[in-house]
Structure formats: structure tokens, C-alpha cells
Amino acid sequence: MAHGILCGKGSPPSPIDSPEEINPGQDVTFIRAITPELCIEAVTKLCRQILPRKLSIDPNQDVQVLAPLHRGIAGIGNLNDQIRDSLNPHGASHSMGSTLFREGDKVIQTRNNYDKDVFNGDMGIIDSVDSINGKIEILFEGKRIIYERMEIADLQPAYAISVHKSQGSEYPIVIFPLLKQHFMMLQRNLVYTGLTRAKKKVIFVGDPAAYSMAIRNDKTLVRQTDLVRKLTKTET
């Protein structure tokens, strides 16, 4: 399927109309949810109920939502808020500007911190929140890191992240919202990158027409190819 996407061929799997219909043995699934509101509802239901029940997985450890845009109802910001409220509604919390962090939240480091030995793209789980002193303690793989008040700005919620941020990483299960409202980002390489981040299963949630729009649009690939051609011409 990934090769077909690069070639601009292929259509999404036959869409299903409810997360309840998902087949645990199917590698690629498309759930029809053509409005942002329906998309958010389906994504949160997958994370909270369907996937843990049908696949016996931990949504924090095994599921990663990848989205094309930060803003909007089905954007990364609102996805993080809705998934957090669904999976982790009661943890002690601390706000940093407009960003809320709760005990039990999945978070991502957004820049390299050599002193703490954590790097851009590292993911962890908030183990404790000290809202009085403005400190957060995070469990990364094999290590526990304390963030002081000013260091918390280097963290972002990570229930949902951008497709761009996911490059170089892999996850057991990827959920990929894909809507016409994402039209500015609907490109072939976006779908290819999202699909190939999944080790076991990818679940598209959204409008099949948006998938088709993305597959037909290879503008980024064309620009990259043209750049290579120009650079090669300059060197000769």
C-alpha cells in the first residue's frame, strides 16, 4: 500500500461507519467520519474503549495519533485536550500558559536538553505534578526527570502530534485523522509518512475523499525532485 501511495495509486480500504466495526486482524482501516466533530468522537472512542478492549493494549504506550494541522476542531491542540479528558480526566494538574499538564499525561520533549539527557522527540509520562513549586516529574524510558518551572516550556502534550514531528519514529498503532478541512496539508507524502510510522496497524479516521485528494497531490514531491534537478545542473 505504501508503494502505491508514492505512485499516486490506490484507494483507502472500504470505509466502515463506526469504530465498533473495526477488525482487529486488519492492518489498515478507514473509519468514515466526515465532520471534525464526528472525527474527534471516533478518535477518542478508539483510544478510550475500542482498541483497549479489542486489542488489549495500553493507549498511552501503544497508540499514537498523528494529525496534519495544529488548529481547528480536529487539530492537534483540540485532539490532545479531548483525548486527555477521555483517558485521564482526574490527574493533578499544572498549567503553563495555555497548556495544561496532568499526572498520567503523555508528553513530548520539543528541544534537546543535554544537561538532562533528553532530546527533541523523546516521549514520557508525567509521574507527578507539584503545582505549588511549579515542578513536573516525568518518566522517560529507563529514567526519571524533574522539570523546573521554566523547563516545562520544552514540553507539549503528546496524545496527538504532527506527522512532521513523527518522522524517524515508529508506533505499534497509528490513528490518522484526515479531513477536507486539512486541505492545505493534503499531500501524498503526508499520507505516506503517517502510514509508514505504524508497526502493526494504521487507522484512518475521516473523509475518504480527503484521502483521495491527498494521494492525487504530489506537489511536495515534485518540488523536491525539481530542487534535486536544479542542484545537479548547478554542479555540472
Regions found by a protein language model. Give the residues of each.
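C-terminal accessory regions
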Residues: M1-A2, D122-T236
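Conserved helicase motor core of P-loop NTPases
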Residues: M1-V107, N113-K116
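Conserved flavin/dinucleotide-binding core of flavoenzymes
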Residues: F119
